[in-house]
C-alpha cells in the first residue's frame, strides 16, 4: 500500500528566472516532478502566472506542481487547466481554509498540496492533521535548516 511505503522523489523547485529553460533541464536530468514557485504573486497580491505554467507544461513531460498566488477556487482551476498536475497552497490554506476543501471536492484531493513552514508553525503536527481533514492530498514541509527536531516532526506527521 502506497501510504505505508517510504519513497523519495526528486522535485526541483523553480522560481521566475528562466523557469522554462530550467524545467527542460530538470526534465532531461530525470526529475520526477517539478515545482514552480511564484512567491512574488502572493507577496504582490497578483494572480498566479498561468502563462508560465502553460509554457512549462508544454515543454516537459513530467508533472508540474504550481505554487504561489492562489487565493480563490478560480486560481486553482486556471492552474490545473493550464496543465499543472497539482496546486500547492500556503497562505490560502492559512487565510481561507475552506478553499482547501472546495478545491479538493472539485478537483480531487490528490491534486491539492498544502505547505507547512516548520520555522513558522507552532504546532506543525496538529496543523498537518487539520490540513488532511480539510482535504489536502499531500503536504509540503518547508524548513530553513534540517535539524534533528524537524526530522522528529516529519516522522510524527508521516504517522
Which positions does each model-derived feature cover?
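Hydrophobic, well-structured mid-protein blocks that either form specific transmembrane helices
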Residues: 79-120
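Short amphipathic alpha-helical segments and helix-helix/interface helices
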Residues: 23, 53-54, 100-104, 128, ...
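Short beta->alpha connector loops at strand-helix junctions that form conserved
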Residues: 68, 89-92, 142
